[in-house]
């Protein structure tokens, strides 16, 4: 039973990603653009703040993000995770911070208010950047919630590789560099909390 409790934090986001993928692509209730991040649409349609992470443009996109969740799970196990809901806490904390960064970049830095964005990769790279610092320095608490992450050189090296690959991958066509950078910065901020 304890194993199942620990896995819930990874099963829930994976299930939501698969469920929305099936609803959008096989049932046709929504279009991807109806639920995606859209800078100018966030004010009138705030549900997009929650929905865009769980929407994916195609099956390969979905699988690559599910692979990221599996990597996060492996790393949490090797960091001797004490809090069985840490990944869910990180999702809840990363989402608004990442959305804020994207909104600022899109509306004030690059003035691209029609920017559309989907996918879980911003949360994944945000979690990777959080784990990079946690594996280097250790992290006992987030907002007075005990998490008890210990230093781990193996995870530090793994996160360095995955974050580097994530940044390089961001320069490919149709991949959101701003989404990945916002995720990385959000993970660093959460580490500081």
Q: For the regions a protein language model found, what residue spans apply to each?
A:
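A detector for small-residue-rich transmembrane helices and their helix-helix packing motifs
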Residues: 2-193
């Amino acid at each position: 039973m304890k194993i199942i409790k620990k896995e819930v934090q990874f099963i829930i986001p994976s299930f939501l990603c698969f469920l929305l993928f099936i609803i959008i692509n096989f049932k046709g209730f929504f279009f991807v653009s109806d639920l995606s991040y859209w800078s100018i649409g966030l004010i009138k349609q705030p549900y997009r703040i929650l929905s865009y992470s769980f929407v994916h443009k195609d099956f390969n996109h979905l699988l690559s993000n599910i692979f990221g969740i599996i990597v996060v799970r492996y790393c949490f196990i090797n960091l001797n995770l004490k809090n069985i809901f840490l990944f869910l806490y990180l999702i809840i904390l990363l989402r608004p911070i990442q959305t804020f960064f994207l909104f600022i970049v899109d509306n004030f830095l690059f003035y691209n208010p029609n920017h559309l964005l989907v996918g879980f990769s911003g949360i994944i790279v945000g979690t990777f950047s959080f784990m990079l610092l946690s594996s280097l320095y250790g992290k006992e608490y987030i907002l007075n919630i005990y998490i008890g992450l210990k230093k781990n050189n193996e995870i530090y090296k793994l996160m360095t590789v995955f974050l580097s690959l994530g940044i390089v991958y961001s320069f490919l066509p149709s991949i959101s560099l701003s989404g990945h950078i916002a995720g990385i910065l959000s993970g660093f901020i959460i580490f500081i909390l």
